[in-house]
From Swiss-Prot:
It comes from Shewanella loihica (strain ATCC BAA-1088 / PV-4). This is 3,4-dihydroxy-2-butanone 4-phosphate synthase. NCBIfam families: ribB. It comes from the Bacteria. Pathway: Cofactor biosynthesis; riboflavin biosynthesis; 2-hydroxy-3-oxobutyl phosphate from D-ribulose 5-phosphate: step 1/1.
Amino acid sequence: MNQSLLSPFGDAITRVEAALTALRAGQGVLVVDDEDRENEGDLIYSAEHLTQEQMALLIRECSGIVCLCLTDERVKQLELPPMVEDNSSQYGTAFTVSIEAKVGVTTGVSAADRVTTIKAAIADDAKPSDLARPGHVYPLRAQPGGVLTRRGHTEGTIDLMKLAGLKPAGVLCEVTNVNGTMARLPEIIAFGEQHKMPVLTIEDIVCYRKSLLEKAS
């Protein structure tokens, strides 16, 4: 990762702390993974603060495949099976079956309907019968251990929510360019400046978590 491009956002610790502040305020953040991995940037919001306007931005400015990152415990609570029995995707992205709220939606695809589905899935008393399957929201199961176990956007999202003191559930979507290609770091930084969103990397989150572990030891 060309960290020099991120220098205006401070060092790794500063970038993570800026992201946590933004998430607590209900704002979005942009997270870029390793260049030798997907080399993509995701726009991430906390699920509990998610608004219809934010969902519309995800649909309009990103790939449109809006994913809901959940802990293993929440996936079990909702009884969401894996999308496939044999996951052969390159990075083992842990999609479950897609979901839809059973109450309060129409076709399920509008920004408002997708927000309703996400709020139903993260409710404290959520139960499997609250959700229809399949639907237009794509849950992702985060690995226990977060980015220290798997350096993916799914784990990065859950780690950020936990570090921010928020409900451990987040919404993400890959940022794309106007021509449909995937946005890389220069375009993601420009997107962040346009929308006043902090930019950070998975490596930043790894460094931040390791620094906390060192302080605790």
